[in-house]
């Protein structure tokens, strides 16, 4: 099998994103959220590695995720405020974007939303709602997410 250059993969995914972007918001989310669900277990494992124990609460998840971000020199953090959790970040948190494997595109934010819904719901023991308030991928200066418990 021939090795395909990263640039070819990046181009192919960019065109896929462009096609998905032609759809309505509900369809975009339906396609991209499952990709984030697939990444949730990887992030949960990282949080547990940095914590040195299983994530068994929202507090542990927030602490672990903030430790992961600090360990990777990423700015911004998660904060628990009553019945919601807010995160404001200065860069896209997607490791595929940060590594250069894919280019940042607005539809990627639905992927992040799926990841957050999965990981926060698991830690909360119930479904949560994730609102994308601002997004670098959509032209804002920061990414801001609100988790409604």
Report each predicted region and the residues it spans.
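Active-site helix/loop of acyl-thioester processing domains in fatty-acid/polyketide metabolism
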Residues: 107-125
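N-terminal accessory segment detector
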Residues: 1-107, 128-136, 140, 149
């Amino acid at each position: 099998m021939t090795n395909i250059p990263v640039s070819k993969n990046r181009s192919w995914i960019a065109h896929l994103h462009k096609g998905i972007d032609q759809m309505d918001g509900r369809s975009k989310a339906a396609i991209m959220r499952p990709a984030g669900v697939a990444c949730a277990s990887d992030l949960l494992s990282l949080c547990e590695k940095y914590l040195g124990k299983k994530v068994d609460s929202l507090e542990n998840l927030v602490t672990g995720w903030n430790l992961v971000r600090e360990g990777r020199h990423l700015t911004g953090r998660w904060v628990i405020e009553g019945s919601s959790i807010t995160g404001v970040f200065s860069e896209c948190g997607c490791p595929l974007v940060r590594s250069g494997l894919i280019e940042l595109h607005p539809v990627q934010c639905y992927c992040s939303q799926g990841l957050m819904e999965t990981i926060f719901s698991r830690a909360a023991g119930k479904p949560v709602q994730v609102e994308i308030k601002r997004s670098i991928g959509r032209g804002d200066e920061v990414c801001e997410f609100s988790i409604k418990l």
